[in-house]
Amino acid sequence: MTAQALFDFSGAEVLVVGASRAGIGAAIARAFQDAGAGVVITGAEPEPAPEDRGRFPYVQLDVTDQDAVRGLAARTPRLDILVNCAAITARGEEMEPSFFEHVVNVNLHGTFRTALAFYPHLKASRGQLINIASMYATFGSPRNPAYGASKAAVQQLTRSLAIAWAGDGIRVNAVAPGFIVTQQSARSRSDPAHVAAVNLRTPMGRWGQPGDIAGPVLFLASNAAGFMTGTCLAIDGGYSIA
C-alpha cells in the first residue's frame, strides 16, 4: 500500500463529537474532510463556529443526555470513525462537588455514552474510536481537579475498550494534547507570565495549534496505525518529558 493510500479516507464516514468551536474538534473535522471523508460534527452550541457553517452537517448535542446520544446513533446509518472531543472545565470551581460532577459527566461519562451508542456502527464497519484525553491526565492541577481526573479516566477507558472491542475489529486509541491555542485556553493565555513559563518548559518553545492535534488523530485512524490499539499519544511539544 502506498503512503498516499494509507491516509486516504475517501468514502469513510466520520463523526466528531465536540466541534462547535474553532478548536481541536473543528481542526480534526477539517483534516478528515480534506482527506476525503464525509464528516458530521456536533457541539453543545446551537450552531458551529462561523467558519464551519455550511461546511459540515451539524447536530447540537448534549453528551450528558443519554436519550439524545442514542437518538443520534439511531439516525446515523453508518459510521467508520468516531472522535470523542467534547469536554469542559470549570476553572476555579471544580472543588465544589456539583461542578466536579458536571465536568466528569461531560468529559468521562459523555465519552463513554457516545462510544457505547455507536459501538454497533463501529463493529459493523470494523472502525476506529479516537478519544481526546489531555496532558492533565498525567499532571496534577490545583484549579482543575475534575478535568484532570476525567481525562485520566478517559485514558483508562481507552485501554479498557481497546481490549473489550479488539475481537470486533475496532481499534481504540487516544491523544493527550498539551497547551493548545483554543478558546478554552484563552483565559490562561491572557497571563503573559504563564505563556512565557509554558514556552520556557516546552522543548519546542511554543504553544500548540489545533492543527497540531489533527495530524496524529488522522494517523491513529489510518491504515498506517493498523497494529495500534489502546495507546495514547502525547502531543505537547515535549512538555511532559521536560
How should each PLM-predicted stretch be described?
Residues 2-4, 23, 139, 200-204, ...:
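Short C-terminal tail/terminal secondary-structure segment
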Residues 6-39:
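Canonical Rossmann dinucleotide-binding motif of NAD(H)/NADP(H)-dependent dehydrogenases/reductases
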Residues 91-104, 198:
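Substrate-binding pocket helix/loop in short-chain dehydrogenase/reductase
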Residues 115, 150, 158:
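Active-site helix of classical SDR
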Residues 134:
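Residue(s) in the substrate-gating loop at a strand-loop-helix junction
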Residues 166, 171, 228-230:
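Short, small/polar-rich loop/turn modules that mediate ligand/substrate recognition or access, typified
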Residues 174, 193-224, 228, 237:
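C-terminal helical subdomain
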